[in-house]
Swiss-Prot record:
Gene3D superfamilies documented for this protein: Band 7 domain
Protein family according to the UniProt entry: Belongs to the band 7/mec-2 family. Flotillin subfamily.
CDD domains hit by this protein: SPFH_flotillin
SUPFAM superfamilies in alphabetical order: Band 7/SPFH domain
Keyword S-adenosyl-L-methionine set for record: no
Lineage, uppermost ranks: Eukaryota, Metazoa, Chordata, Craniata, Vertebrata
Main function: May play a role in axon growth and regeneration. May be involved in epidermal cell adhesion and epidermal structure and function.
Species of origin: Danio rerio (Zebrafish)
Post-translational modification: Palmitoylation may be required for the formation of higher order complexes and for neurite outgrowth in cultured neural stem cells.
Protein name (Swiss-Prot/TrEMBL): Flotillin-2a
Keyword Membrane in record: yes
GO CC annotation, single: endocytic vesicle
Length: 428
């Protein structure tokens, strides 16, 4: 059987041998691979960046000046399968330190060879170009090892014989000399130029003064013209302002008048509305109640009038009905009386003296009542007589006078009625 092996992205897994034969190799970067026991070999190689510090001491340049150069290089194993195979052939099984040592020696060799072809000034003054040249020369050799140079820079350049400092001093002296000469020439040129400038300045000043005077005169003339024009414009502006102000004032007054007219109209409208409101209020509070009261009184009067009319009509109808009833009653009574009289007349005619006697007897109580009416107010009657027989005589006398009175009243002669004859004449 076998095992499964894994590596991170900073390492490459190299699998060799196995079922694929003795020449079969596989490279796995940041992954996994299967390996058979006993017949498969598993190894790892780092892909991390390696920092190298190549240093070449006392290397003679093209001018024979011994200098020391130090640099910094960043290198790593390339991941292309072919180049990774080259790296595995060269460094598989070696430590990182051993790999760094091989690459460092290669870079230092190329650095020495390049230093011999350049001057100190070229190396010192153009370090970037020098580093680029080293990188271009060393890249093919380390590339055949499967190594890539990511960067190469010159860290320091110095020497033990003070060549660089002397070079700097000579250059400094030359620069100082050139500076002094330049200062002297500048001062000379400055003096000459100053004199020329003074002359030019005087000429220019004279011309300037002349021009200034002319300019001043023209300025004064222009000022006068400007002042005149300004005053004219001011007067015109003032006049225009006053006219405009008068117009604006007139507009304002017109606006005020219009506002007053509008206010008056509104006031009149308000007063008219107030009058209408007052009228409505008076109508509602006085006229309507008065009209209602008048209508009420009118209705009451009309009702009373109607009541009186109806009452009068009812009374008249009542009187009419009563009159009609009384007339009917009287008519009926009259008819009854007439019928009674007719019947009585017939009876009288039929019965003769007997009927007359009945009439007399019927009328006697009434006559007696009428005669005795004055006596109704008399409590008692006392007859004074010394002789007891005299009273009887008085009664007889009254009875004897009664027929005469009845005859005078009714026309009936009671003396001819047998019954009364017996009553008035007891001796017979």
């Amino acid at each position: 059987m076998g095992n499964c092996y894994t590596v991170g992205p900073n390492e490459a897994l190299v699998v060799s041998g196995g079922c694929c034969g003795s020449d079969g190799k596989t490279y796995t970067v940041g992954g996994w691979a299967w390996a058979w026991w006993l017949i498969t070999d598993i190894q790892k190689i780092t892909l991390e960046i390696m920092t190298l510090q190549p240093k070449c001491e006392d290397v003679e340049t093209a001018e024979g000046v011994a200098i020391t150069v130090t640099g910094v290089a960043q290198v790593k194993v390339m991941t292309d399968n072919e180049l990774l195979g080259y790296a595995c052939e060269q460094f598989l099984g070696k430590t990182v330190t051993e790999i760094k040592s091989v690459i460092l020696q290669t870079l230092e060799g190329h650095l020495r060879s390049i230093l011999g072809t350049l001057t100190v000034e070229q190396i010192y003054q153009d370090r970037d170009q020098f580093a680029k040249l080293v990188r271009e020369v060393a890249a093919p050799d380390v590339g055949r090892m499967g190594i890539e140079i990511l960067s190469f820079t010159i860290k320091d350049v110095y020497d033990k014989v003070d060549y660089l400092s002397s070079l700097g001093k000579s250059q400094t002296a030359a620069v100082q000399r050139d500076a002094d000469i330049g200062v002297a020439e500048a001062e000379r040129d400055a003096g000459i130029r100053e004199a020329e400038c003074k002359k030019e300045m005087m000429d220019i000043k004279f011309q300037a003064d002349t021009k200034m005077a002319d300019s001043k005169r023209e300025l004064e003339m222009q000022k006068a013209a400007f002042n005149q024009e300004v005053n004219t414009k001011k007067a015109e502006a003032q006049l225009a302002y006053e006219l405009q102000a008068a117009k604006e004032q007139q507009k304002i007054r017109l606006e005020e008048i219009e506002i007053e007219v509008v206010q008056r109209k509104k006031q009149i409208s308000i007063e008219e509305k107030e009058i209408l409101r007052t009228d409505k209020e008076l109508i509602a509070t006085v006229r309507r109640p008065a009209e209602a009261e008048a209508f009420k009184m009118e209705q009451l009067a009309e009702a009373k009038k109607i009541k009186k009319v109806l009452t009068a009509q009812a009374e008249a109808e009542k009187i009419k009905r009563i009159g009609e009833a009384e007339a009917g009653s009287i008519e009926a009574v009259g008819k009854a009386e007439a019928e009674k009289m007719r019947l009585k007349a017939e009876a009288y005619q039929q019965y003769g003296e007997a009927a007359k006697t009945a009439l007399v007897l019927e009328a006697l109580p009434k006559i007696a009542g009428k005669v005795a009416a004055p006596l109704g107010r008399t409590n008692e009657i006392v007859i004074l007589s010394g002789d007891g027989g005299r009273v009887t005589g008085e009664v007889n006398r009254l009875l004897a006078e009664l027929p005469v009175s009845v005859n005078a009243l009714t026309g009936v002669d009671l003396s001819k009625i047998p019954l009364l004859q017996k009553m008035t004449n007891p001796q017979a």
